[in-house]
Structure formats: C-alpha cells, structure tokens
C-alpha cells in the first residue's frame, strides 16, 4: 500500500512541478536499461516523485555539498515530507508503510542525483525500521514520529576499531546497574556521528563471547558519557559526517533496550540484509546517471573526424555497461522481493545481489569515466564524484569478501 507516501499535501506540489522536470526524467528513462521496466503503476509514480525531487532538490547542489562537506539536513527534511524518512515504517506513527522493493526503487531514484546523501537517508531508514519492528509501542511512539519527519536523525552503530567484518567480536560493554546500563567502549566509522540525535548501538550485555552476548540499545545524543571523535576526512560520502562514538560510563535507561537481551546480533544482521539491498540500490542510481552521461558524451565528442559512438569499441563497451547495470537491477529487486516475502534463503540472494551490483555498478562508473577521457578526471564533471561515492559500497554493509563467505557457506551445505 502506498497511501502513507502520498498522504501529505506535498504530493500535489511535487506532481505540479514535474512538468518542468519532464525532460530530465525522459533522459533518465529513455535509455537501455530503463529503470521503470517491470514496475507497477504505483511504483512508477513514486519512482518519478523521487526522481523529480532528486533532480530539483539534490542534483543542482550535489557538487557544492561534496566540495564543502555540507550535511544537507534541510533537504533531507524536505524528502521526509514526501514520506522518505520512514519508507517502511508503519503508518500509525507517520511512516509510509512501503515494502523493501518499493524502498529500493525510491533509493535508486534519489541516488541518481547524490549517492552520498541518499546513502545516509538509507541508513536513517534502516534505524527507523528497526525501532518499528523490534521496539515496544512506547519506544515506537517516543522515537519514530520525529525520526520519520527527520526532525531528528538516527545512526547505526555496529563497527568498532577492532571489529569490522567480525562483528560478533565487538567489545563495547553494557553493564546493568539498577534501571540503567553503563556503557564503556567505542564505535568507529559511524555515519552521522556527532550530528544524529539517536544512535542504535550494538553492545555486549552478556558474558558470552561471540554473537550471543550482544544486545541493541537506543542512545540519545545528549546522554552524559557519550562523546565523539574528530570528523573523518574521506575519499567519498562527503555530504555526511563520519565520526567515532566514545562511551565512558555512559548511563542508558534499561527502557532503551531494543528487543531482548542477547537479541542484538540477530537485529544487527536483519538490519544489514535490508541495508545491503539499499546500498546496492544506491549503486544502481549512481551507475545509471553515469551511463546516461557517458551515452550523451560519446554522441558529441569527436575524434578522428567522427563521434566516439561510431567506434565499435565504444559501442561494445556501452553495451556491456548497460547489460551489467540491468543484471544488477534485476538481482537487487529480486532480493528485495525475497526479503519482503520473508524467504528463509533471502540473505544468500541479498549477498549475491549486493556483491554483484556494487562491483558491477562501480565498473560501469569507472568505464563511464574512461569514456570521458581526461575530462572524466576533472571535477567539472560529476562522474568522478559518483566514482568516489560508489567505491565504499564494496566495503560497508558487509565487504565483498564477507558476501562471498555467506554465499560459499550456503553452497557447502548438503541439505538443499
């Protein structure tokens, strides 16, 4: 159902503004592969809404935001007015109540203009979705309305300085003391760190080593004992701040426990399943824009007295790029549909989709830069920004190696 997405008055203004964006939209869709192929009419409608928003509110400023490392919270709040702050949060607290497949379509469209900002919107949605699924009614009503509107934003906190891919070895400790937990430890590479008002933090509450002793706590920004490291300087994703979180005798109410004690690792992995689809969708959006840019460039750029598109090598390269992008999109959307259907093997197909899409979309972006020649290396053109932003997708939400591990473990089972 999509009523939550369209219930706000902003729907009409966005649809009215769509006329002036029609040429940009046609450019995005009038190419093989067409991102709207196979979608329902409802899905096409909110895909167009997301694309119009991206073209009008994000694309004209993305280069400036990247250069100045500006975190566009004002624009994200505008996105939330369209329902993009709680895409799969239930409607009773203001969410849009959409599926993970629907979310992937929206995220791809937004990322076509600005991968970095869209990736943070995805992370925020992941956090809101976890509270909606695992939180108590009291927690849902306390936290979700302000998160769905993006008046407050949320960050996901799993990685630590000493535990990346081996998430089950995390060491941030939460010791129970009456009606509070006392947290000590740190988290690394946290998107939104220092700016977000709400942090979903995976901590060790039990004595057991490994995943069984991990729990999930909601920590608010102004909690005494919580501090932040320096803002990291990064290759890409420059429109969102990244900092470490430091807990020093940080007292968090027991009432901020999400789910049950010991359930945190399961919650974290569930979050990553959705996050992997979203980050793959971000890769799709960036690669689609690069393919369009490369297609337009080879039509007008001439060498040896003819346009580049007349050379068979360029034609075949473009054909390969389009095929990689289309295959990636099919895999991401299939994985999202499996997650919606609660298919028990969804995590394996999600790993395949994330691995393939993030790798191949990065190659499409790199090939686009190559087709631009020296111009592609200049910041006058957006392809280099997409390339920098897409590179990290092969590391976060589970690296390429971790995806291969998940897939190979499933292949080695005898009970299929």
UniProtKB/Swiss-Prot annotation:
GO terms for cellular component: mitochondrion. Keywords: Activator, Branched-chain amino acid catabolism, FAD, Flavoprotein, Mitochondrion, Oxidoreductase, Transit peptide. Gene3D superfamilies: Acyl-CoA dehydrogenase/oxidase, N-terminal domain, Butyryl-CoA Dehydrogenase, subunit A, domain 2, Butyryl-CoA Dehydrogenase, subunit A, domain 3. GO terms for molecular function: flavin adenine dinucleotide binding; short-chain 2-methyl fatty acyl-CoA dehydrogenase activity. Its EC number is 1.3.8.-. PROSITE patterns: ACYL_COA_DH_1, ACYL_COA_DH_2. The active site is at residue 397. Substrate binds at residues 165, 273-276, 409. Disulfide bonds: none annotated. It is found in: Mitochondrion. Homotetramer. This is Isobutyryl-CoA dehydrogenase, mitochondrial. The gene is acad8.
């Amino acid at each position: 159902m999509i009523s939550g997405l369209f219930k706000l008055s902003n729907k009409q203004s966005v649809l009215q503004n769509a006329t002036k964006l029609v040429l940009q939209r046609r450019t995005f869709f009038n190419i093989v592969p067409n991102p709207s192929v196979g979608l329902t009419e409802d899905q096409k409608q909110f895909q167009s809404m997301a694309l119009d928003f991206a073209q009008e509110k994000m694309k004209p400023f993305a280069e400036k935001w990247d250069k100045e490392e500006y975190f566009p919270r004002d624009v994200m709040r505008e996105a939330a007015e369209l329902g993009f702050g709680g895409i799969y949060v239930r409607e009773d607290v203001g969410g849009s109540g959409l599926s993970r497949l629907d979310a992937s379509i929206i995220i791809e469209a937004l990322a076509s203009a600005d991968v970095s900002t869209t990736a943070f919107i995805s992370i925020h949605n992941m956090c809101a979705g976890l509270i909606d699924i695992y939180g108590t009614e009291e927690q849902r009503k306390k936290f979700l309305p302000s998160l769905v509107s993006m008046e407050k934003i949320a960050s996901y906190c799993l990685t630590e300085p000493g535990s990346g891919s081996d998430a089950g070895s995390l060491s941030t400790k939460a010791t129970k003391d009456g009606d509070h937990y006392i947290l000590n430890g740190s988290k690394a590479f946290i998107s939104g760190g220092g700016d977000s008002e709400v942090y979903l933090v995976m901590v060790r509450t039990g004595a057991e080593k490994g995943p069984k002793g991990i729990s999930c706590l909601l920590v608010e920004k102004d909690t005494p004992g919580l501090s932040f490291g320096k803002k990291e300087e990064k290759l890409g994703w420059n429109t969102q701040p990244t900092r470490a979180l430091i807990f020093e005798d940080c007292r968090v109410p027991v009432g901020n426990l999400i789910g049950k004690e010991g359930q945190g690792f399961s919650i974290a992995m569930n979050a990553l399943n959705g996050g992997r689809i979203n980050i793959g969708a971000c890769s799709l959006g960036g690669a689609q824009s690069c393919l369009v840019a490369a297609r337009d460039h080879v039509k007008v750029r001439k060498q040896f007295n003819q346009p580049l598109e007349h050379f068979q090598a360029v034609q075949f390269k473009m054909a390969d790029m389009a095929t990689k992008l289309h295959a990636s999109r099919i895999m991401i959307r299939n994985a999202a549909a499996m997650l919606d259907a609660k298919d028990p093997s969804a995590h394996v197909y999600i790993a395949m989709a994330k691995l393939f899409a993030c790798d191949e979309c990065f190659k499409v972006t790199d090939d686009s830069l190559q087709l631009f020649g020296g111009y592609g290396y200049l910041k006058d053109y957006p392809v280099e920004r997409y390339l920098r932003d897409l590179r990290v997708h092969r590391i976060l939400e589970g690296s390429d190696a971790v995806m291969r591990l998940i897939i190979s473990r499933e292949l080695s089972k005898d009970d299929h």
